[in-house]
Amino acid sequence: MKDLLNLLKNQGQVEEFDAIRIGLASPEMIRSWSFGEVKKPETINYRTFKPERDGLFCAKIFGPVKDYECLCGKYKRLKHRGVICEKCGVEVALAKVRRERMAHIELASPVAHIWFLKSLPSRIGLLMDMTLRDIERVLYFESYVVIDPGMTTLEKGQLLNDEQYFEALEEFGDDFDARMGAEAVRELLHAIDLEHEIGRLREEIPQTNSETKIKKLSKRLKLMEAFQGSGNLPEWMVLTVLPVLPPDLRPLVPLDGGRFATSDLNDLYRRVINRNNRLKRLLDLSAPDIIVRNEKRMLQEAVDALLDNGRRGRAITGSNKRPLKSLADMIKGKQGRFRQNLLGKRVDYSGRSVITVGPTLRLHQCGLPKKMALELFKPFIFGKLEMRGLATTIKAAKKMVERELPEVWDVLAEVIREHPVLLNRAPTLHRLGIQAFEPVLIEGKAIQLHPLVCAAYNADFDGDQMAVHVPLTLEAQLEARALMMSTNNILSPANGEPIIVPSQDVVLGLYYMTREAINAKGEGRVFADLQEVDRVFRAGEAALHAKVKVRIHETVNDRDGGSVKNTRIVDTTVGRALLFQVVPAGLSYDVVNQPMKKKAISKLINQCYRVVGLKETVIFADQLMYTGFAYSTISGVSIGVNDFVIPDEKARIIDAATEEVKEIESQYASGLVTQGEKYNKVIDLWSKANDEVSKAMMSNLSKERVIDRHGVEVDQESFNSMYMMADSGARGSAAQIRQLAGMRGLMAKPDGSIIETPITANFREGLSVLQYFISTHGARKGLADTALKTANSGYLTRRLVDVAQDLVVTEVDCGTEHGLLMTPHIEGGDVVEPLGERVLGRVIARDVFKPGTEDVIVPAGTLVDEKWVEFIELNSIDEVIVRSPISCETRYGICAKCYGRDLARGHQVNIGEAVGVIAAQSIGEPGTQLTMRTFHIGGAASRTSAADSVQVKNGGTVRLHNLKHVERVDGHLVAVSRSGELAIADDFGRERERYKLPYGAVISVKEGDKVDAGSIVAKWDPHTHPIVTEMKGTVTYVGMEEGITIKRQTDELTGMTNIEVLDAKDRPAAGKDIRPAVKMVGLDGKDLLLPGTDVPAQYFLPANALVGVADGAQIAIGDVIARIPQETSKTRDITGGLPRVADLFEARRPKEASILAEVSGTIAFGKETKGKRRLVITPNDGSDPYEELIPKWRHLNVFEGEQVNRGEVISDGPSDPHDILRLLGVSALAKYIVNEIQDVYRLQGVKINDKHIETILRQMLRKVEIAESGDSSFIKGDQMELTHVLVENERLSTEDKFVSKFTRVLLGITKASLSTESFISAASFQETTRVLTEAAVTGKRDYLRGLKENVVVGRLIPAGTGLAYHSERKRRREMDKPTRVSASEVEAALTEALNSSGN
């Protein structure tokens, strides 16, 4: 009996492991796995259904079909365990061994493994240094390959067709060896001397100059080193033994009616065995070569189809014309092993049902139908019934439950008490898609859900379904309660703002009760306290909206944890006083003394959480909800068609617009305007008309005339139901009301272009047939868009999760001093996001000083909370360096200081938090809200006039940043740099706005000047680019000859003459190479030099430049020598929404990207080539000049002699992130990508914290490219993991050797996921075949560091509570180590002890 227990205990237990290695299987290894050879293609006997001997289901090889019973039935039962029946040869064992035992097929002729042949780059091809085409010709018996040339003129590896082979035979006889087929390839692979080849390649690479050759050689070298290091032998890529999968993994099931359902693999194996047996027979018969050859080729094709059907040639199809599913198809794709069974499994103890609303529940509860609870908690109920003695056995308990006796319900209620259940709604886009609740038993069949958690689940009650899961173990229940309870998830992990926020009815109710009305019943009364207000309201003596005075007693918590009590009389309304009754102590009355719109309610809950804590907030949120529902019921808000008040002015506005359109039409007819201009004008006109109608409508709706206490008629905010819904933020918006009561306006065609004729009607008036038809256009496009968007957004989320899944907080502080420089985010001159908001929840990397002093006001290492934010804003700090995930130096994972605050909890992030996945979910979840469209800049947008001045919006002090300028005689400054900026700071020194200043801008203010709001501080001409002189002197023309390089023009209007420089192609032959310029000469006639350099001051003039100064004229500093006309930049389509986010994360290079200066120095233009200009930058430090050819059509922002800094824009266009990283570094790249992505989300009103984007960016920057290898084993141009290179460099520097130098590389998220260290994670993401092939050849080890790998091998993930489990496991093993001693050590110790005692 003891044996039996031990046996059951040790079944299939695996020793602990820390890594998984994948490699090539040698023939010996395949034979060692095998339990016998499959010799026949038979499967099972069609009459007896017993497996055939030596067939694909043979019981002798694979084990018995029934538990502990041999095939012929001689031995049955457990007592014969392990006996091998002498009659049928079957071992008596468990039937489940048929899932584990493998067999093999001895192949009559070697066969190349298709993965190593055809998966690009072909590994066999690389090793043999032959093209794939050539190898295929050898393998499929089209050509001979020379294996050993002997003493002949042939070369090893040379291909010979039949003709050449026979010629060679005639010429050389048996002196050489040439064969075809996989044996030839195997021979060649076997003959490769890895060590010798590696040495040869290492010598060859430094001596090669061509880039492509180096690439090819280093690829070969890498592969050879991989083979050498992994212990794989090259010839193992050619199979001589084929393993056979255990039969229960490729089942054959008899169906009714004598037919069988079978796995495709069986068919594929049968073909292989058939062909193999036939080949053996042919070889025994020594058949003609051509027949044998054909059979070998067919065998090769059969094995190819088994391993990866369809990889080469046409896929083999079954009886129903469907391609057969091969081994490779089993593991790849959504239905493959990885994604279907290993990463996502079905769960027991779960149920699903429709959800309905549970307005009476508390936040931590959900309503669970009794029937469902009974089924889910069955085992618990059985146990309880037995424990109580109500049932004697489990069977009896089962009967009781089935009969649904009254005792059962009592027991169920007891079992369920404080046993949380998990509720999940698909699609689970972020972690709030699964939360824990305490179940409350309800009648009926639908699950009841608390209204406040709907936002997190994105649930509504129009037929949504949700799933219930029961956490069984005590640990699971504990985690569900402590971490997943809905009451612990009040804040959104994406932005740290409350997600448990009332919406719709609740908002409407709260808004209604906090509005004020003029001359309502009880206006002007004064109340002693809130209780009195309550009594008077209930008695009906005062209306809800009456303006009254109330004495209130409030306790206000300050930020330091203290509290102040005070009593005051406030002007308020009855409703607000009633609402204050549910507000927790600690908050001031001012938070409710306003109409409670949605934003205000959200702010109130946020403040409540920060000031009084979690518990109070949860209670308060519930109370808010109850109150909101109560008062929205009382309000009786409903919509009737009369609520849509159409403005009287509408007809007049539309008539006027129609008249103007007619006028434009007649202009077009008479040829005064072009089609495009007409279109743009008409669309602008209608847009304006639409705005006017909606303005009139809103002013109509939002005000109503009432008579106040004194009998005077006054305006008050309207109580129109529709207006209240929109104003409170409960439902609808001004844009929607406009369509209902104003006019529908312009419609777009499916391709995005706007239709000229707008819909002038609204929904109250009704649409005509034509108008309805036009509007269907847009509506259908919207539906099609939504469907596409969902799929695209889901795929983006999947890629993000995959790239970031192994990023976990693993230590508290990595000790780095680096970080990102944070400044306020400015767009179009306005501060969109102040500094305070951006640094909230971050750790300061370096001390922050009070501006203008040496006093540290925020020390490094401070976690910035709301209190610090106020402090930073007050001290008018413009920039702060904060720790960031990008600059974190933790090797595996990230440190808590660099991450900062855990947004969902409001304190520093815990060790073990899976911040990568949270970041991916936060960015991916709102993806469905982003638009899919590309914005065509048409209509109004394309004709916004180019900016030509800076007009400040706020008064304040001028600050100039990074601006190179010269001062003109009249005291104005002229900008002579491109990156200059002008900012306006308020009285506290906080920047309010910031503007870019172009080259040549005339600035009428100086640093520190005070300006008033609305004043214009800078001007420039947007249509020309000036060349400004930086010194005074005399103008001298160089190479400017009329008719050859220049022409004079007289302006007809002004009568002034201008000199225009001719384009090179318009010049006569004599002027082609002359470069016209304007030189500055001093009074002594000598050339002047540019200030601070020894470069003569001469300005080369590009084609079409207009020169405005005469030869010999005197000019002063800041004067314009010439103007270069700018053709207005072409309107580019802006990629918006989801595609833009995907482009940024995939790090795609944009078309016609901007050109940046590669080095800092002086610009010059060299000799032009056809269609290209030669740009030369001479560095100031005297190193070699940098040259670049730029197409002529690119408009350049720089001219000869100008100084540029590395990374400055030379030609405009969309930025290329790779250029930014290379030239400006990681922090500039981070700033660019974060801002670009935030712009897309901000447009949709979605808030995401910057650190999530930085977290993904950290993963995209994992790799580096080796620039110089130093004394390391790296090869120049290799891409390596950053951590790997850093570890190696540390080792080298301790040994006083030369370290390798590297540059950072930016990878797109798909590429980064595929190039991760873990092959399990990469294989389960995409391109499974390629990943596994590469991993097997290089003998990769997966150290199971990420989450995905651990899920696949069925372990706890190394994050959250799992991290503690893993570290504890490792610690235990370290402690156990000394106790594990080998026998030889024991013997040695004994001998020593005996010897010493003997002396």
From Swiss-Prot:
Cofactor mode of binding and number, as noted: Binds 1 Mg(2+) ion per subunit.
Cofactor entry: Mg(2+); Zn(2+)
GO MF annotation: an example: DNA-directed RNA polymerase activity
SMART domains: RPOLA_N (SM00663)
Catalytic activity: RNA(n) + a ribonucleoside 5'-triphosphate = RNA(n+1) + diphosphate
This protein's UniProt keywords: DNA-directed RNA polymerase, Magnesium, Metal-binding, Nucleotidyltransferase, Transcription, Transferase, Zinc
Residues annotated for Mg(2+) binding in this entry: 460, 462, 464
CDD domains: RNAP_beta'_C (cd02655), RNAP_beta'_N (cd01609)
Superkingdom of the organism of origin: Bacteria
GO cellular component annotations of the record: DNA-directed RNA polymerase complex
Pfam families assigned to the protein according to its UniProt record, in alphabetical order: RNA_pol_Rpb1_1, RNA_pol_Rpb1_2, RNA_pol_Rpb1_3, RNA_pol_Rpb1_4, RNA_pol_Rpb1_5
E.C. number: 2.7.7.6
Subunit: The RNAP catalytic core consists of 2 alpha, 1 beta, 1 beta' and 1 omega subunit. When a sigma factor is associated with the core the holoenzyme is formed, which can initiate transcription.
Record's function text: DNA-dependent RNA polymerase catalyzes the transcription of DNA into RNA using the four ribonucleoside triphosphates as substrates.
Name the UniProt record assigns to this protein: DNA-directed RNA polymerase subunit beta'
